[in-house]
From Swiss-Prot:
Its EC number is 1.2.1.59. Pathway: Carbohydrate degradation; glycolysis; pyruvate from D-glyceraldehyde 3-phosphate: step 1/5. Pfam families: Gp_dh_C (PF02800). This is Glyceraldehyde-3-phosphate dehydrogenase. GO terms for cellular component: cytoplasm. It is an enzyme of class 1 (oxidoreductase). It catalyses: D-glyceraldehyde 3-phosphate + phosphate + NADP(+) = (2R)-3-phospho-glyceroyl phosphate + NADPH + H(+); D-glyceraldehyde 3-phosphate + phosphate + NAD(+) = (2R)-3-phospho-glyceroyl phosphate + NADH + H(+).
Length: 343
């Protein structure tokens, strides 16, 4: 029997997770929810998803009916049929859903990176914490930036012990569909204090990095991708070739070369379009080969993170771990990647 997955919040993350679940042969989407009758709600129905109203209120149901969008009921009409819920709600709403819906109905749930690490049993990355999250009820898939950092640090740590990491994050201002968030013409410290929250978020996945990782971040007026500059000190001697080989062996990381035309995040997104990727998603972390350098025992590199899609395969693996569908994290990763057509 395929695992029954409910997507609560058919937005930027939710619609991608719904499509990714539909690509797997061991799970299925039993429903998706929306809070308002917008074009995304209409498209969900047109794609064949059963639509439910996220807010259990008859007046809210009537809004959908008046808009001509058929709904199957509210989330309370489907919640107990689900083996697991993937929460795609906006920041802070996920915790409310956890306390008000998921826990009272005793259904497993995955929250996203906008929620607090302390609000769940554990924090998920397929490479680092799959086994820890195995069979747990309430887990958070960490944010896009943290996911990218976890992947690259896994690659480096596979060949040398990490002594410390110093990372500068250049964050996109907003997603492409966000017409409210800025800045439009500024570079904004985010936060103005150092360190930023990204280091502790990595530690929530990899506790052994406590005291070893420090991050700072700024926001720039772009919508396409985040970019990271890493300076990682390791214990022992490694070469540039060692690092490049480790990166290429790590799943969900791809390398690109500026000399091949990948001169910016815009070119990476264009690559996704030319590949025919749905929504031009780049689920893989992208590392520039030319940026990789080693000075004594310190590694330098630059990487790009597609914030809308990097966490999607992680959600799929998290479903398998929590529902105890596959014990081996690498087998789950391989299965997910093959179904989604990613590396």
């Amino acid at each position: 029997m395929p695992a029954k997955v409910l997507i609560n919040g058919y937005g930027s993350i939710g619609k991608r997770v719904a499509d990714a679940v539909s690509m797997q042969d061991d799970m299925e989407v039993i429903g998706v929810t929306k809070t308002k009758p917008d074009f995304e709600a209409r498209l969900a129905v047109e794609k064949g998803y059963k639509l439910f109203v996220a807010i259990p209120d008859n007046e809210r149901v009537k809004l959908f009916e008046d808009a001509g969008i058929p709904v199957e009921g509210t989330i309370l009409d489907i919640i107990e049929d689900a083996d697991i819920v993937v929460d795609g709600a906006p920041k802070k709403i996920g915790k409310q859903n956890l306390e008000n819906i998921y826990k009272p109905h005793k259904v497993k749930a995955i929250l996203q990176g906008g929620e607090k690490a302390k609000d769940v049993e554990d924090n998920f990355n397929a490479l680092w914490s799959y086994n820890r999250c195995y069979g747990k009820d309430y887990v958070r898939v960490v944010s896009c930036n943290t996911t990218g950092l976890c992947r690259i640090l896994y690659a480096i740590n596979s060949i040398a012990d990490i002594k410390k990491a110093r990372i500068v994050l250049v964050r996109r201002a907003a997603d492409p569909n966000d017409d409210k968030t800025g800045p439009v013409n500024a570079i904004t410290p985010n936060p103005v204090t150092v360190p930023s929250h990204h280091g502790p978020d990595v530690v929530s996945v990899v506790p052994e990095f406590e005291g070893k990782i420090l991050t700072s971040a700024v926001i720039v007026p772009t919508t396409l991708m985040h970019m990271h500059t890493l300076m990682v000190e390791v214990d022992g001697d490694v070469s540039r070739d060692d690092i490049l080989e480790a990166i290429k062996k790590t799943p969900r990381i791809i390398t690109v070369r500026a000399e091949d035309g990948f001169s910016s995040t815009a070119k990476i997104i264009e690559y996704g379009r030319d590949l025919g990727r749905l929504r031009y998603d780049i689920n893989e972390l992208v590392v520039w080969e030319e940026s990789i350098n080693v000075l004594e025992n310190e590694i330098f590199l630059m990487q790009a993170v597609h914030q809308e899609s990097i966490v999607i395969p992680e959600n799929i693996d998290c479903i398998r771990a929590m529902l105890q569908m596959e014990e081996d994290n690498f087998k789950s990763i391989e299965k997910t990647n093959k179904a989604m057509g990613i590396q």
